[in-house]
């Protein structure tokens, strides 16, 4: 357990120390750093459903376990995400929103932590298209690794997009605070942001594909859907999966 106090703004170190001592010293004593425990996931894959009868939309989350934030594949994983679902023109959003019209938006992201992270893709879709949407997600996952391997143009566009976004990380007081928090929380090198664009630029297709082969494994997939179970289960677009109803565990009726 470790506590960080990150302050940005028109102030001084002396002022921060004065008020932080008053606010926290009596409540919190200095403690040694304790590393995050090694967490063992349930047996994978996992397919869960929460039943909301009458829901006009289904919320879909599809996830994969991944490595810690400081893993050497971080930059390749970041570029992979940008291609797969990290931007408006990404593959998954283009498929489900623009081509199929199932959703207003479908995206992907990493939730990073010290030892174990999770890669997720998700959004809300019309209830009647729940299983069809899952089929398209499965298709995009498999094609990324086989018949539609990213080519140079797609790779370069993804990297350019990430680099173009970079200045926005410094545009406000709160965004600078987020940067400092990120460095502290993940124990990053102090020059991490100075080298970020260069490290993104160096990512190769081979590195992205190595991440894809390790990350996008159907055998380790985790799916959670929240919607009208009756409509979803009566859908003719079937995948070879059986959902576990966890409604009672999370919804009080």
Regions inferred by a protein language model and the residue ranges of each:
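Charge-rich, well-structured scaffold segments of protease-associated domains
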Residues: 1-32, 99-100, 104-253
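His/Glu-based metal-binding/catalytic segments typifying zinc-dependent metallopeptidases
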Residues: 32-89, 252-253
């Amino acid at each position: 357990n470790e506590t960080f106090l990150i302050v940005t703004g028109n102030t001084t170190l002396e002022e921060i120390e004065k008020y932080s001592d008053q606010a926290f010293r009596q409540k919190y004593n200095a403690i040694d750093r304790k590393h995050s425990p090694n967490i063992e996931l349930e047996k994978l894959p996992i397919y869960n459903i929460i039943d909301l009868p009458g829901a006009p939309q289904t919320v879909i989350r599809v996830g994969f376990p991944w490595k810690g934030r400081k893993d050497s594949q971080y930059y390749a994983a970041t570029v992979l995400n940008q291609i797969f679902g990290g931007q408006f023109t990404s593959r998954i959003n283009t498929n489900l929103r623009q081509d199929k019209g199932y959703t207003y938006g479908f995206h992907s992201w990493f939730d990073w932590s010290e030892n174990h992270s999770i890669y997720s893709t998700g959004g809300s879709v019309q209830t009647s298209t729940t299983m069809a949407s899952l089929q398209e997600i499965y298709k995009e996952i498999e094609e990324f690794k086989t018949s539609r391997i990213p080519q140079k143009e797609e790779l370069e566009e993804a990297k350019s997009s990430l680099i173009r976004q970079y200045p926005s990380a410094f545009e406000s007081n709160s965004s600078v605070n987020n940067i400092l928090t990120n460095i502290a929380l993940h124990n990053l090198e102090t020059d991490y942001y100075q080298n970020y664009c260069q490290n993104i630029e160096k990512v190769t297709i081979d590195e992205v594909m190595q991440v894809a082969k390790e990350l996008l494994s159907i055998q380790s997939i985790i799916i959670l859907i929240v919607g009208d179970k009756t409509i979803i289960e009566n859908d003719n677009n079937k995948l070879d999966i059986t959902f576990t109803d966890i409604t009672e565990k999370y919804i009080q009726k």
